[in-house]
A protein has these predicted regions:
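Charge-rich, low-complexity intrinsically disordered segments
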Residues: 100-103, 169-205
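Acyl-donor binding region in acyl/amide transferases
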Residues: 85-171, 175-176, 180
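A short helix-loop-beta-strand connector motif used in the catalytic cores of GNAT acetyltransferases and
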Residues: 47-56, 76
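Short, solvent-exposed loop/turn elements at beta->coil junctions and helix N-caps
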Residues: 40-47, 161-164
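Short amphipathic alpha-helix that is part of the acyltransferase structural core
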Residues: 1-44, 59-62
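Short hydrophobic/aromatic beta-strand element in the GNAT-like acyltransferase core
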Residues: 42, 53-57, 68
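Short, His- and charge-rich active-site/binding loops that engage polyanionic ligands
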Residues: 59-91
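Short, charged, solvent-exposed linker or helix-capping segments at domain edges/interfaces
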Residues: 81-82, 112-113, 183-189
Length: 205
């Protein structure tokens, strides 16, 4: 089950969001040592966690976070355009048909195989979600190691510029072109499976 959380239904998912923000702190602050704001000593929440953010969240039967990602509109404030435009050789792509993938977070307590399965379910849900909303392109900023994985997943993806060293970590920007062929391309590499979640198709963004 993948929950799609927006400003319209966020009140229903407060506990799941809190669990997600706690894991984001464990992963990005405690493990990766990113210099990010921490709220109440527990939650990694930044300026982009606003009313325009869309979250895809997978939880266990108790509502605890297993994996998540955040999607941001690029015609508004977003990470690539605001913080890392220099990673793009021709400027950060912005449009109402472009969304940015951010904060892909997998529960660090899960075994590696489980994390991979959760990641694939999140990617599948993301593809279904953006196709349903006629989003044509996804962008993002990731470490060079994860960028290499993204480029090999099978979809139409390319770097937006050369990776650069930032605060001791090599990072790069990418774009993914999304269309009706994307699910099939990802199925060929064992990543995509259709995700059935009733509420997301009815959810207003």
């Amino acid at each position: 089950m993948v929950d799609i959380v927006t400003a319209a239904n966020r009140w229903e998912f407060r506990e799941r969001l809190d669990s997600m923000f706690e894991d984001r702190k464990r992963v990005f602050v405690d493990l990766l040592r990113w210099a990010l704001p921490v709220t109440d000593g527990r939650f990694e929440i930044d300026q982009f966690d606003d009313a325009n953010a869309v979250y895809l969240i997978i939880s266990d039967s108790a509502g605890l976070h297993l994996g998540s990602m955040r999607l941001l509109r690029t015609d508004r404030s977003h990470i690539l355009g605001d913080l890392f435009p220099y990673l793009c050789a021709h400027g950060a792509p912005t449009d109402t048909k472009i969304m940015e993938i951010t904060r892909l977070c997998l529960c660090p307590r899960l075994p590696a195989l489980d994390r991979r399965q959760i990641r694939n379910r999140l990617i599948s849900g993301m593809v279904d979600y953006v196709l349903a909303r006629d989003i044509k392109t996804l962008t993002g900023v990731v470490t060079a190691r994860f960028l290499a994985q993204i480029l090999k997943m099978g979809w139409r993806c390319e770097p937006l510029g050369l990776p650069r060293m930032v605060d001791g970590t090599t990072i790069g920007a990418f774009r993914i072109d999304i269309d009706e062929a994307t699910p099939r391309l990802l199925q060929m590499t064992g990543i995509y499976e259709p995700v059935k979640f009733k509420e997301y198709l009815d959810c207003k963004v």
